[in-house]
Regions:
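Interfacial segments of alpha-helical transmembrane regions
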Residues: 10, 14, 75-103
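Alpha-helical transmembrane segments of multi-pass membrane proteins, especially transporters
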Residues: 44, 93-98, 190-194
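Membrane-embedded catalytic cores of phosphoryl/pyrophosphoryl-handling enzymes
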Residues: 2-3, 122-225
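Aromatic-anchored segments of alpha-helical transmembrane domains
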Residues: 22-25, 99-104, 170-180
Length: 225
């Protein structure tokens, strides 16, 4: 019971830290702070021309942050785990994460209306959908929950847990770097997306820890995915 309490507390603290980072980035964006200057400099980089095959790879790797793909993968795993262990828990958590992501990130995009860097002008309330990045928030929340469920409903394995953590980290970083290379998002969009996605992930895991379930084989340790 004490381990569970510490786990919930740890996830809530991390959610608060991630949300604080998102708020700070948002303030910077709203007031054209130092981060927006970095945004402008990165947007002006000369991107190299890639051969068709390399451009195809980059384009498709960017889909790792696509809402439809990530949702399909997560729900497929959730349904499989639900049928195997006769529980609605994976599906309910997945549905909660997708609803939270679309509600929070979607409303934020509409509220800020930030233009994309490809327009070569950074404007708010201009009908844009750039901030925060849906690709970045999708990557860390949806793939994070995918990894969490895969580890939770499997036999205890430190290797599997570490592999899940590193996999989600690599995918999230890859999505950020590809977005910067393709100039589809400002850096602050991406950092904001990662932070709000992480905050939602930690909150959902905390909810899962608070509401007990008898169908779980393995609950990852406090500092797991």
């Amino acid at each position: 019971m004490e381990v569970l309490r510490r786990s919930v507390s740890w996830h809530i603290r991390n959610a608060a830290v991630a949300m604080a980072i998102f708020i700070l980035i948002t303030i910077d964006v709203l007031h054209s702070g130092p981060l927006t200057e970095i945004d402008a400099n990165i947007a002006l980089w000369n991107r190299p021309e890639l051969p068709d095959w390399a451009d195809w790879i980059i384009y498709n790797l960017d889909h790792l942050g696509l809402r439809g793909l990530t949702a399909l993968c997560l729900l497929t795993l959730a349904i499989y785990l639900g049928r195997r262990f006769k529980t609605w828990r994976p599906f309910n958590l997945s549905l909660l994460s997708l609803l939270a992501l679309n509600l929070v990130v979607g409303l934020a995009k509409l509220e800020f209306g930030r233009t994309k860097p490809k327009l070569q002008i950074d404007l708010l309330d201009a009908g844009g959908m750039s901030y925060p990045s849906g690709h970045a928030s999708n990557a860390i929340l949806t793939w994070g929950l995918f990894a969490y469920l895969a580890v939770k409903y499997s036999a205890p394995s430190k290797f599997r847990t570490n592999l899940a953590i590193w996999s989600v980290s690599v995918v999230s970083i890859l999505v950020v770097l590809i977005s910067l290379f393709r100039n589809t998002h400002w850096l602050s969009d991406l950092v904001g997306g990662v932070s709000i996605g992480a905050a939602l992930f930690f909150l959902i895991v905390a909810i899962d820890r608070v509401i007990s379930s008898s169908r779980t084989i393995n609950t990852p340790q406090v500092h797991s995915v």
